[in-house]
Amino acid sequence: MHQTKARKTLKDAPVMWRRINSIGIILDCNSTYAANLGYAKSEILGKPIFEHVPKESWEAMNDSLKTWFETGEVTDRKITFKRQDGSTFPGLLQATSLYDENKNMLGSNTVIFDLTQMTDEKITEYKKFFSEANNRLGEIKEKEY
């Protein structure tokens, strides 16, 4: 129940969100992620993350994965992403690990900011979203414990 509410918060996010498994296959994403990349969600799920990165950025994405495997998170990693139409955009990637009850890594929740959209208006929208999301997640946590 609580995971469903937390997941809904991510699915409704104005930022790109995806969940991957431990080998980099996309298990879920929000509509913002799909729309920014120009795909239907069904075309994204089950694909490797490298399909949304131009070849010249594979090394940067691979370094990001390596950092994630070693530390369980990635913070402020600049990566170039590729849309379905072949155009690219600079993104800022943040990832945190997901673990099972035995502390085995299952995958990650990843948030990506399109740096070409970082206007004052967008930053205000993001701040509002994250403030509200933090409050909702706090309420969920209080009910859970």
Language model regions located:
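PAS/PAS-like sensory domain cap-loop motif
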Residues: Y33-I44, K55, N102
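PAS-family sensory domains
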Residues: I20, T80-G86, L93-T96, Y99, N104-L115, K127
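Conserved hydrophobic beta-strand signature of PAS-family and PAS-like sensory domains
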Residues: I26-L27
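Charged alpha-helical signal-transmission linkers that cap and connect PAS-family sensory domains
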Residues: Y99-N102, T116-D120
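PAS/LOV and related PAS-like sensory modules
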Residues: M1-S22, T124-Y145
